[in-house]
């Protein structure tokens, strides 16, 4: 009987380890160049390439799961996936709910974009994605916050006149401004927010978080992380 119980215990542990070696990475799939869905219907972008390399270095099999931004932390906590890699800035408020790895991008500025340079940023209507560091910042100003579920909707709100400007990560806004043929411009000063972007894990998964944290460090040490930052975010983006 003891041998049977021991065999069952060993099998259970083996199954647990096997399950832990398949990691479900949760991302939004709607925030280029960090993450987006390509023409083949696959997750693509900076974080797809980064995540695949981190899984390789951590010796784990990974699969990608997409989830709307406004429920991305609750659905991590409830077990829909095992980690978030979705352009999520490290903030004290989020650290109360999840544990982060070290950052895989340095703190990057946020910026305002609008249809003209004479926008009232302090008293106007400013669009931002729900649950972001940008939406939290707007509430500390005199502006009226207009929140949307996706980043594309925040830009559309400016284009159709619902909002005077949008506040978002500058890396996200740069290609939109550059491709607008002058219709959209940056307004005001860049705003440093957050502590850089990291992977988020359930507080009950410290071992998994540690493996990915170590993998991020190896990419910093050998320069491959900087190479990915330049490739996807541009030469002017902060790097390590």
Question: What label would you give each PLM region?
Answer:
Residues 15-20:
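Sec/Tat signal peptide C-region and signal peptidase I cleavage site
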Residues 21-88, 222:
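Extracytoplasmic small-molecule ligand-binding "clamshell" domains
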Residues 29, 106-111, 174, 178-217, ...:
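Periplasmic-binding protein-like
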Residues 48, 64-74, 130-131, 146-160, ...:
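Short helix-initiation/N-cap motifs at beta->coil->alpha
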Residues 48-57, 116-125, 129-133, 196-235:
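Extended ligand-binding regions for polar small-molecule ligands
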Residues 60, 89, 94, 100-146:
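A conserved helix-loop-strand patch within extracytoplasmic ligand-binding domains
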Residues 61, 133-153, 186-187, 216-240:
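Ligand-binding clefts/hinges and TM-proximal coupling segments of bilobed small-molecule sensing domains
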Residues 71, 88-97, 164-193:
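A ligand-binding cleft/hinge motif common to bilobed small-molecule-binding domains
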